[in-house]
Amino acid sequence: MKIKQLGIVSAGVALATLGTSAAQAALVVVPTGLNPGDQYRLVFVTSGTRNATSSNINDYNTFVTNQVTGSALATQLTTAGFNLGTITWKAIGSTSATSAKVNTGTDGSQPDVPIYLIDGNKVANNNADLWDGSIQTFINRTQIDTSGTDSVWTGTNVGGSAQSPLGNSGFPPMVTIGSPVQTDASWINMIGLSSSNSYTLYGMSSVLTVPTPAVSVPEPSSLLGFITLGGLMLGGAVRKARK
């Protein structure tokens, strides 16, 4: 009887472990189709919020970086073989002194690479595609693996330059917001709202290189199969215990 009970416990533990892995694998930091040595960027929307009263772009970069620190995104990057100390995070936002294109290095000053949401979906083929007035998918996944729907501070127009920028000193102090659930121009430039409000920010990584060898993180669909197998194991153990 003890052996049967052990079988049930073991199967249950296996099932629970697989279930946990499935939940963690929802974030994809090495998109499908990329090979070791390939370069790309990742983007996300923060789960946390802040005001837009500062005219110092570094305040927003620090906020975005702090959102990643210790998050599910950071864990997934480490699991995939990245050195977190070599990755920088910048806000996709503009102040009067620094445009979003310059701040993120998508102005041609850095390698021109594809840009992906942290769920594996492509946002833009390259820098020009990012700033052509539309993107390919919502930027609505947060660093803690939740869906973001709140408005996003950008201070930016569709071309990546400042428009009603972060820290706007005009009266009233209006700052441009975008929507994480839009792919047209509204993703970055929707309306202007008071800078004293609290909204989220978009974050973009520095240029990443797929590690060699790349660490493969199972897709959620594959993990579903493992979970099903775990369920069958558990069911079999229970049936045997009843005999």
Where in the sequence are the language-model features?
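Intrinsically disordered, low-complexity segments
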Residues: I8, G19, A214, E219-P220
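Compositionally biased, low-complexity segments enriched in small residues
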Residues: V13-A16, D150, V217, L224
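Juxtamembrane cytosolic interface motif at the C-terminal end of transmembrane helices
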Residues: T20, G235-K240
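Hydrophobic alpha-helical segments
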Residues: A22, N61, T200, S222, ...
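Secreted/extracellular ectodomain signature
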Residues: A26-S216
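A short, hydrophobic C-terminal helix/tail in secreted or cell-surface proteins
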Residues: P218-A237
